[in-house]
From Swiss-Prot:
This is Hypoxanthine phosphoribosyltransferase. It comes from Escherichia coli (strain K12). The active site is at D103 (proton acceptor). E.coli cells express two distinct 6-oxopurine PRTases, with very different specificities for hypoxanthine, guanine, and xanthine. Salvage enzymes allow a more energy efficient synthesis of purine nucleoside monophosphates compared with the de novo pathway. The kinetic analysis suggests that E.coli HPRT is mainly responsible for the synthesis of IMP and that XGPRT primarily salvages guanine and xanthine. CDD domains: PRTases_typeI. Keywords: Cytoplasm, Glycosyltransferase, Magnesium, Metal-binding, Nucleotide-binding, Purine salvage, Transferase. Disulfide bonds: none annotated. The lineage of its organism: Bacteria, Pseudomonadati, Pseudomonadota, Gammaproteobacteria, Enterobacterales. GO terms for cellular component: cytosol; protein-containing complex.
Length: 178
């Protein structure tokens, strides 16, 4: 499919918003008294996770999960698979799930359900991008970077068939007539 990528959210805007999210998260957890774990959902969240964890000024651990509901195309599937689980125990800890983009909410709902069974002290979600118009499952999201329209986006860790993760901005994929 011939396509091009148009800048939707520039790099500077992303950096500024992540700094603000870091301040909000720090404020929320600074007096918790519990250990905190940021759980990045791979692969898409890796850039966001790296930048966000430097902005959160509360001592925290970092762990990762891989959950997938995407094939190689441009739409989500309802089937959610856990491909990599956490390495650490989260019982009694403040857990913040860090996601790149929330679309249908199916993947995040499943991950949240799995993690809640492990008895964390608290469980919250932070996403860089939110597509509320695509939501099929109501998932509580405490920290949102940007709400965006129903566009297929890439960049800043988000891919299209494993391409474009390297872009420093969020771009909109535009299909071209062939």
């Amino acid at each position: 499919m011939k396509h091009t990528v148009e800048v939707m959210i520039p790099e500077a805007e992303i950096k500024a918003r992540i700094a603000e999210l870091g301040r909000q998260i720090t404020e929320r957890y600074k007096d918790s008294g519990s250990d905190m774990v940021l759980v990045g959902l791979l692969r898409g969240s890796f850039m966001f996770m790296a930048d966000l964890c430097r902005e959160v000024q509360v001592s925290h651990e970092v762990d990762f999960m891989t959950a997938s509901s995407y094939g190689s195309g441009m739409s989500t599937t309802r089937d959610v698979k856990i491909l990599k689980d956490l390495d650490e125990d989260i019982r009694g800890k403040d857990v913040l799930i860090v996601e790149d983009i929330i679309d249908s909410g199916n993947t995040l709902s499943k991950v949240r359900e799995i993690l809640s069974l492990r008895e964390p002290k608290s469980l919250a979600i932070c996403t860089l991008l939110d597509k509320p118009s695509r939501r099929e499952v109501n998932v509580p999201v405490e920290f949102i970077g940007f709400s965006i329209p129903d566009e297929f986006v890439v960049g800043y860790g988000i891919d299209y068939a494993q391409r474009y993760r390297h872009l420093p901005y969020i771009g909109k994929v535009i299909l071209l007539d062939e």
